[in-house]
Amino acid sequence: IQGILNGTTNYMLTKMRQEGWSYDQALQEAQRLGYAEADPFNDVSGQDAFKKLMVLSDLAFGEQPDWSEVEVIGIDTLTLDDIKAANEKGLRYRHVAEVEKNADGKIVGKVAPMLVDREHPLFPIDDVFNAVSMETNYIGTLTVTGPGAGMYPTASVMVEDYAEIIGKRAGFVVSI
């Protein structure tokens, strides 16, 4: 499983690439638009994506990797020059969270900036959108996308989660 799990960082990387904005300019605009918190540490450091990755790992594999072994690198390590150089080569930086079961059966994960080419399913995902791409046994690669930053996507997810929890307690399935 690989994914862009934080819409704020994806927005910032998109604006740095498309508009030539510095990291600070992209962050300030993300904050102004309500995509980033006043303290953006959890977003830009990769901690938010890490926590979401642990949930995905539980859903996919029924367990999580050892948290202390998951490398987490934020987007603050990237410069505008890095992004421009990648773009000139037809590549894009994405802040990717990934988890897999290795050959030994161990669950391993990582969150870090990653260069992707046009063939990668995360290549076209821009702005505040999130995406999760999964390799499946029967249908190949399955990629799901949707908005991932801002007040409405956050509120929507909270309502859906609340309805699901209440539905499970009452013994029925809620679909929103």
What are these regions (language model features)?
Residues 9-21, 51-65, 161:
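Oxidoreductase and adenylate-handling cofactor-binding alpha/beta cores
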Residues 25-124, 129-131:
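Substrate-binding/catalytic subdomain of NAD(P)-dependent oxidoreductase enzymes
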Residues 8-11, 36-37, 139-141:
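A short, flexible beta-alpha/helix-coil linker loop
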Residues 1-16, 27:
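Rossmann-like dinucleotide-binding core of oxidoreductases
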Residues 2-6, 112, 135:
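Short beta-strand segments
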Residues 2, 16, 39-47, 72-76, ...:
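Hydrophobic alpha-helical scaffolding
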Residues 119-176:
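ATP-dependent carboxylate/acyl-activation modules
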